[in-house]
């Protein structure tokens, strides 16, 4: 949520900045008009309340003097009725103002590349050497299905499109990856959390998914509950409506959770493989910090995500997203994209964002500064990382000509010493068939 006082004071600044995110100038004008009307209505209400107080005094004076108080009583009642009408009008105006404010995205940070599409993202750095294959690299879904560790067909039978069964060493690889990620983040000072997977509408509003993006999630019929699209929601809402003790800042938390997304609007895109699923595991990083430290914390968070990829020895690059491609709540976002050999391109595996006080205002999450004054915290979130996409990148980058997959060295201890996935060892209950 943006600060209405700042919009009132600098309307042209907000029109210019939010235009880069697709917001029309008229939308800012509407907010300013509603804010002006609100202040006028409140002034009228205060004036009438003062008049009613004066009329009430006249009633007492008339009774003390043995005079008729009928006129003063009538005036008091009429003013009371008008105040009730104004209160109703204020309530309706506030609801409309709140709704329009809730649909305005965060202001992009200076230097964020300006574009209403994803085109124009700026590459910050490229890390790792892209492997030169002496054979035609296969897609991860073909590798996984050939080894028997990924079963999309049976998942389709049981659940539908965009679901998968991980089997045998495939399931162990997924588990190895997310356990490795969590361990690495805890080394960097993050506290592991196991949060709820179902949240209420207030939580979805707090992190900015509601009201604008309801079509992208799974809601429980007949209840004010939603399956989380990301652990960002329960992690960031942990302190909703609270004042965080200053000595606790900055707070770093991390969690592994499933993420549930309807993928509305994704028809025809990434219909095969692990890239775009309705249910997938993701390790999330969330930070609460003082405003003066949030940009440094964004760089640290991005480095935390990069650390995983470096230790897995997976080639990737880091880009700054455009104004039109950032998430609704972000002021700046750094994306990490993994190299996928079979697709011959980079694919997103992490987004690290500084949301400034945008989410904190929606959640009413504050701290006290050195003068004891309440201030909004800044919140940051980042994937650390999307597990399925990381597994997909491992399958493609570590594949061998015979169809086997070598396990990244750092994951071997998490795989109980297994160094390679082959048809012979991939799925134990099929071993007798493969032998």
Swiss-Prot record:
Pathway: Aminoacyl-tRNA biosynthesis; selenocysteinyl-tRNA(Sec) biosynthesis; L-seryl-tRNA(Sec) from L-serine and tRNA(Sec): step 1/1
GO BP annotations, alphabetical order: selenocysteine biosynthetic process; seryl-tRNA aminoacylation
Keywords associated with the record: Aminoacyl-tRNA synthetase, ATP-binding, Cytoplasm, Ligase, Nucleotide-binding, Protein biosynthesis
A GO MF label: transferase activity
GO CC entries: cytoplasm
Subcellular location(s) of the protein: Cytoplasm
EC number(s) stated in the UniProt entry for this protein: 6.1.1.11
Chief location category: cytoplasm
Note on domains (UniProt): Consists of two distinct domains, a catalytic core and a N-terminal extension that is involved in tRNA binding.
Record's subunit section: Homodimer. The tRNA molecule binds across the dimer.
Record protein name field: Serine--tRNA ligase
Organism ancestry: Bacteria, Bacillati, Bacillota, Bacilli, Lactobacillales
